[in-house]
Amino acid sequence: MIKRVKTGIPGMDEILHGGIPERNVVLLSGGPGTGKSIFSQQFLWNGLQMGEPGIYVALEEHPVQVRQNMAQFGWDVRKYEEEGLFAMVDAFTAGIGKSKEYEKYIVHDLTDIREFIDVLRTAVKDIGAKRLVVDSVTTLYINKPAMARSIVMQLKRVLAGLGVTSIFVSQISVGERGFGGPGVEHGVDGIIRLDLDEIDGELKRSLIVWKMRGTSHSMRRHPFDITDKGIIVYPDKVLKRKAVIELE
């Protein structure tokens, strides 16, 4: 039997037929405003409620801002940080020189993937982390897209070896096909894509599981909502996107 990690996101584990297989690295890709950060933060918070320590690697926002964003949903991680069950890795303020005063785990040079991996490894071992989020992994290869797959593979090898189940947030531009970064989809175990589509003059949220190693899963596109308590997915509903006809 494959051990599974429950996302705890209402409706999501049904779509994944029980949860994410343990040690999988999942690419969570989507355009701006699709709910990627909320999804990944909810995954970590739910892990804490199940007694599974977690790590959030902040590359897009200041760790202080991340804590505030999470608290808006009622996910106050500070208590867990004090208890050594949750850790924030600051890979955002690299180069500003302010970080040392606040954060325990800091990445100083984002171009040095070995340093990045060393900081993650230390944090994982310190708190016995079971879940980890990198938000966003795209930042690591934004200036060197040819390195995307290699970087993802290096991270995956280390994190899976440490027994961690990970979500890598991946940014794509509006309307872009694919999952962000050349070849990254081949370097991960799972892909969940979040979309925001205009249907009949209204923006609708939906997600689809493109692949998930070690489990069967729903092959349909399911609608979801972002509420004041986080994301709710509707496994019994299917969203049909209007076909876009391209004229010659």
Swiss-Prot record:
Q: Mind listing the UniProt keywords for this protein, alphabetically? A: ATP-binding, Nucleotide-binding
Q: Which family does the record assign? A: Belongs to the UPF0273 family.
| Name of the protein described by the UniProt record | UPF0273 protein TK1590
Q: Which residues of this UniProt protein bind ATP?
A: G30, G31, P32, G33, T34, G35, K36, S37
Gene3D superfamilies assigned: P-loop containing nucleotide triphosphate hydrolases
Per its UniProt record, what InterPro entries does this chain match? KaiC-like_dom (IPR014774), KaiC_dom (IPR010624), P-loop_NTPase (IPR027417), UPF0273_KaiC-like (IPR022475)
> One Pfam match, by short name?
ATPase
> Which GO molecular function annotations are given, in alphabetical order?
ATP binding
Q: What is the lineage of its organism?
A: Archaea, Methanobacteriati, Methanobacteriota, Thermococci, Thermococcales
- KaiC domain boundaries: 3-247
Which NCBIfam families does the record match to this protein? thermo_KaiC_1 (TIGR03877)
Write down the species.
Answer: Thermococcus kodakarensis (strain ATCC BAA-918 / JCM 12380 / KOD1)
